[in-house]
Amino acid sequence: MINFLEYSDREVLVSQVTQTLASDLSSSIEERRNVIFSVPGGSTPGPIFDKLCEFDLDWKRVSIILNDERWVPENSERSNTKLLRERLLIKNASDATYISMFCDALTPELGIPKLQQQIESKLPISVLLF
């Protein structure tokens, strides 16, 4: 069942979602040795990332993976990795590990074996933002 939450404005939404994510990450870190945090790209989660990166968590135990990356090199302006590097993988969260969803294969299909091997060892996903 989906539970829709309403917020009075964008600032309240960002604050409350960020607080919930930080709490969920903290709980996951307490329960597991390492956690995986799956996040979307694009500009929408940017304000959340701006605040979340400041939380005092054991970021060294957090691996971050995009759940909607494009098949473009990470340095491309179209890559969601750029957003993560600029807005989430900074400040306290700079200690987190980033799991890339891109490799040197010509197509996503050809890259699956390499990416699958890299990702499977980190599963399951502990906290998901979508």
Predicted regions span which residues?
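Short amphipathic alpha-helical segments
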Residues: 49-52, 77-78
